[in-house]
Structure formats: structure tokens, C-alpha cells
Design a protein with these regions (language model features):
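A polyanion-binding, active-site-adjacent surface
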Residues: 3, 15-163, 167-170, 175, ...
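Generic N-terminal amphipathic, Lys/Arg-enriched alpha-helix
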Residues: 1-13
């Protein structure tokens, strides 16, 4: 089926778009958008892919679900629109970057700047009904985003996969650790940040790996 997404991804993922589950998923998502607020806005569902073409990916950060409150989600995991207060997990991410790299906490929680540098900010589920966390889980998005991870694993070398929390860590089973760096820790949520997220040094480790593999480090 026809999906509006960056051409480099379209070429890689067309077989997924043509599978029956994806049509069922698309029908469900269209129905949801027609009945009330769903996040992110429909035009931004594939924002992570559009900002970060397949051959430009250097780092993959895996989230679970889009934010479900108004104005927050814009298709990049953990990121919020300009001018929106930082959700707790994002605040903790910026704290870790500050502690790890000595960078000041930014004024904006919009991580588009990371995506443009090759950081794929991938939620496992790409849509959510307003106010209902997890409401679009188990509808097919996970099958689709797993195929994205497998495609990156097989089609690229020397990537960094950052997996926070038990949900994301399970995705590590699809990644060849002989060819890619896999960084795992607790989730940045306030419930777990002090149990292994703070002090994980993932941002400096990712940059060290990229430099060692001839890539430009990310300006986190």
C-alpha cells in the first residue's frame, strides 16, 4: 500500500507495507483519528524516519509509546514540541547528558536536532489515543517497528542501539552485537532513573564508538 515516508525507508520497508497486518493496522489508525484526538498529528507519524534517512542513521534510541497529552508528541521518542515543559523522563535524559558530557540543559525539549544528526528516535508504537497511554499497543505497530530494527541490523554496520528499560532491552535480541554497539540500562523514568540510568554514560560511550568507526560524534 502507499505510505508517505522518506524514500530511503520506503524502499526498505515496502514489503512490510504490503503485508496484511499493515493494512489492518492502517485501517485501525485511520478509524481512531476519525473519532477523536490521536497523537502525534497524522502527518508526523513517520517523522522519525523523515528526519533521519536509512543511510544516515548512526544511533537508534528505542521508546515505547508516544506522549498522550496535548501538544507533546511529534513522532520522535522522548521528544516534545518547542515550548512544551519537559516530561520527567526527558528531564532525566538531559540531566544525564549534563553529568556525562558537561553540557548545559537545553531550553527546548525538541530533539529534532538529534534526528538531523542521525539519531533515529523510534517508538515501538507510533500512535496513541489522547489521554490513554498504551491504547494502540498490540495493533501491529510493534511488528512494523521490529522490522525496522531488523532492517537496520542487517543493512547497516557500526550502529549504536540505546535500550532503556526492560521493554526496550527485549529488542536487543534482534541486534548482532558483533557488528553494532548495544547500550542497555534502566529507564530514565523517575521510577527507575536512580536504579541504573543515571551514571550510565551512554551519550559519551555512543560518541566514542562513532569516532572510533570514523563517524562524527552527536552534539547531544
Amino acid at each position: 500500500m502507499e505510505v508517505r515516508i522518506d524514500p530511503s525507508w520506503k524502499e526498505r520497508l515496502q514489503t512490510e507495507f504490503d503485508k496484511p497486518y499493515f493494512k489492518t493496522l492502517t485501517d485501525f489508525v485511520r478509524e481512531e483519528y476519525s473519532h477523536g484526538p490521536v497523537y502525534p498529528p497524522a502527518r508526523l507519524i513517520f517523522n522519525a524516519f523523515d528526519l533521519c534517512p536509512f543511510d544516515k542513521v548512526k544511533v537508534v534510541i528505542i521508546g515505547q509509546d508516544p506522549y498522550h497529552e496535548p501538544g507533546q508528541a511529534h513522532g520522535l521518542c522522548f521528544s516534545v514540541n518547542e515550548g512544551i515543559p519537559f516530561p520527567p523522563s526527558l528531564r532525566n535524559i538531559f540531566k544525564e547528558i549534563s553529568d556525562d558530557l558537561g553540557k548545559p540543559v537545553p531550553v527546548s525539549g525538541d530533539l529534532t536536532r538529534w534526528a538531523r544528526q542521525g539519531v533515529l528516535l523510534l517508538n515501538a508504537t507510533l500512535t496513541v489515543r489522547a489521554g490513554l497511554a498504551g491504547s494502540h499497543q498490540g495493533r501491529g505497530w510493534e511488528e512494523f517497528t521490529d522490522s525496522v530494527i531488523r532492517e537496520l541490523n542487517a543493512g547497516r554496520d557500526g550502529l549504536v542501539f540505546i535500550l532503556w528499560g526492560s521493554y526496550a532491552k527485549k529488542k536487543g535480541a534482534m541486534i548482532d552485537r558483533n557488528r553494532h554497539l548495544v547500550l542497555c540500562s534502566a529507564h530514565p523514568s523517575p521510577l527507575s532513573a536512580y536504579n541504573g540510568f543515571f551514571g550510565n554514560h551512554h551519550f559519551s560511550q555512543a560518541n566514542d564508538w562513532l569516532v572510533a568507526h570514523g563517524e562524527k560524534p552527536v552534539d547531544w
